[in-house]
Amino acid sequence: MANVVNMNSLLNGKDSRWLQLEVCREFQRNKCSRQDTECKFAHPPANVEVQNGKVTACYDSIKGRCNRDKPPCKYFHPPQHLKDQLLINGRNHLALKNALMQQMGIAPGQPVISGQVPAVATNPYLTGIPANSYSPYYTTGHLVPALLGPDPVTSQLGPVVPQTVQVAQQKIPRSDRLETSPLAAHHHQQQQQLQHQLNNINNNNNHSTAGAAATSTTATTTTNNAAAAAAAAAAAAAAAVMGHHTLEVGKKRAADTTDMFPLVFFCSFPSPCVFAFLNCSIFGFLRLWFSLFNLRH
């Protein structure tokens, strides 16, 4: 996790983290087989305070002017190879400080008011290590333009007015789900409709087989029902005709055209008795005629 660096202490020269060295864990367990001049970690003596597995190197010792013996110096006096590493850290610290002061328009040596510069989450001493390899979700902050400085081409062209540009957000593909295209969804809907139509055709075929068996019964029932309905309609019509005129005692009413309907119906269709009488008369006449014809000859 990145350490929170107070920019006020960094610009005022009070940040001493570039003087910190990590203590050898094998040395703390008395198991380190390397000398202090060979190990890349610190081997501090007993009088040096260790905090969170790190010690602070003596700045005067790096410059070669520390003469504190009684009491002994509470800071670590590093060997030569660790001094070289601390000097590199010091140069990086100074370059970062000068770049920030130049960007903010602060002259070197000018004190910075507390709270003037916000705290920034960064570690200026992890140089040469790509940040994306350890934190792929880390995005560069506002310190990167500050370190790079202004563009000389842009400064010659004059100030640029910022404009608001709407950028379409790119959809990040996910490996745990499959995106459904509109064409595939439409094709799936057509398949569902076709399957529904096939199911309806099969159901109609099944019902037609069962309905064919009941067709004859239905036809007979329909014929009987039609005859009964016709008889009921005729009876209802006759009742309506008869009930249309009320009979008044002592008065005669004029003959209606509908009253002649039963007579016409009766005369148009003679009864079987009439047919029998006519049949007997005709045969009798023919018999009599044949008998007279035979007598003459």
Curated annotation (Swiss-Prot):
Belongs to the muscleblind family. It comes from the Eukaryota. Keywords: Developmental protein, Metal-binding, Nucleus, Repeat, Sensory transduction, Vision, Zinc, Zinc-finger. Its main location: nucleus. This is Protein muscleblind. It comes from Drosophila melanogaster (Fruit fly). Required for terminal differentiation of photoreceptor cells. Vital for embryonic development. Expressed in embryonic muscle cells. SMART domains: ZnF_C3H1. It holds the Pfam family zf-CCCH_10. GO terms for biological process: apoptotic process; compound eye photoreceptor cell differentiation; eye development; muscle cell cellular homeostasis; muscle organ development; regulation of alternative mRNA splicing, via spliceosome; regulation of female receptivity; regulation of gene expression. It is found in: Nucleus. GO terms for molecular function: nucleic acid binding; RNA binding; zinc ion binding. A zinc finger (C3H1-type) spans 18-46, 52-80. One of its GO terms (cellular component) is nucleoplasm.
